[in-house]
Regions:
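Acidic, metal-coordinating catalytic cores used for nucleic-acid/nucleotide bond scission
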Residues: 2-6, 26-29
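Short Gly/Thr/Asp-enriched flexible loops that form oxyanion-binding sites at enzyme active sites
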Residues: 5-14
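Short amphipathic alpha-helical "interface-anchor" segments enriched in bulky aromatics
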Residues: 114-149
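Short, conserved catalytic/metal-binding motifs centered on acidic residues
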Residues: 1-5, 20, 105, 130-135, ...
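Glycine-enriched alpha-helix->loop->beta-strand junction motifs that scaffold or abut catalytic
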Residues: 15-19
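An anionic, glycine-rich sequence signature occurring as long contiguous blocks
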Residues: 21-127
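Basic, amphipathic alpha-helical segments enriched in Lys/Arg and hydrophobic/aromatic residues
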Residues: 140-169
Length: 169
C-alpha cells in the first residue's frame, strides 16, 4: 500500500538508505505543496510534455522540482524532489468529455528530464497498476475478496494468502 507522506516515513527510508516515491496528496505537507507551486513557474526547463494512449489523445505534462528543504514535526531535515504529472485525455465514462487527473510524488531521487517518465511509470504509478490489475480482480473478478468469510484474524490471513496463490495460478 502507499506510504504516508510525512517526515517519519522519510526518516525511516533515509535511515536505511532506501529510495522512495511517496504519493503527495493535496493537504499532505502543505509546506512542500506551497514550495512546489511557487517554484514551477520559475523553472520552465523542468517540464516535459508527452502524448500517449490511443492515437496520442492523452496528454501528460510533467513538472519537477529538486532540492526542496523540509523540516518535519520531529525537527528532522529532509531534502526532497517533487514530481507531478497532469494527465488530460478522453473520459471513458463520459464520451466526448475530457478528464484531468493529477499525480504528485515526493521522492529522494534526483529528478532529471531523462528519467522523469521512467520514475513516474515504474515508481509512482506502479502501485496504481498493482491495485487495478491485482486487487480489483480479487474484489470483482470472482474471488469475492470483500466477503467476510470469518471474523477470526488468523483464518482471514490464511484465506487471503490462499486467495493470493489462487490468483497467481
Amino acid at each position: 500500500d502507499s506510504l504516508f507522506a510525512g517526515g517519519p516515513t522519510m526518516s525511516i527510508c533515509e535511515r536505511y538508505h532506501w529510495k522512495y516515491m511517496i504519493v503527495h496528496k493535496e493537504g499532505d505537507i502543505p509546506f512542500i505543496h506551497q514550495e512546489f507551486e511557487s517554484l514551477v513557474p520559475l523553472t520552465p526547463e523542468n517540464q516535459l510534455t508527452f502524448h500517449t494512449g490511443p492515437q496520442g489523445k492523452t496528454r501528460q505534462e510533467y513538472h519537477w522540482i529538486n532540492d526542496i528543504a523540509y523540516t518535519d514535526s520531529e525537527k528532522d531535515k529532509h531534502t526532497v524532489g517533487v514530481l507531478e504529472c497532469v494527465e488530460r485525455g478522453p473520459d471513458p465514462k463520459q464520451p466526448g468529455q475530457t478528464k484531468t487527473t493529477r499525480f504528485r510524488w515526493i521522492t529522494n531521487f534526483t529528478l532529471k528530464e531523462k528519467q522523469v517518465l521512467e520514475l513516474a511509470y515504474q515508481g509512482g504509478r506502479i502501485r496504481w497498476k498493482i491495485e487495478n490489475e491485482g486487487f480489483n480482480v480479487q474484489k470483482n473478478g470472482g474471488f469475492d475478496l470483500e466477503h467476510a468469510y470469518t471474523t477470526d484474524p488468523v483464518a482471514i490471513k490464511v484465506f487471503y494468502f490462499l486467495l493470493q496463490i489462487a490468483h497467481r495460478l
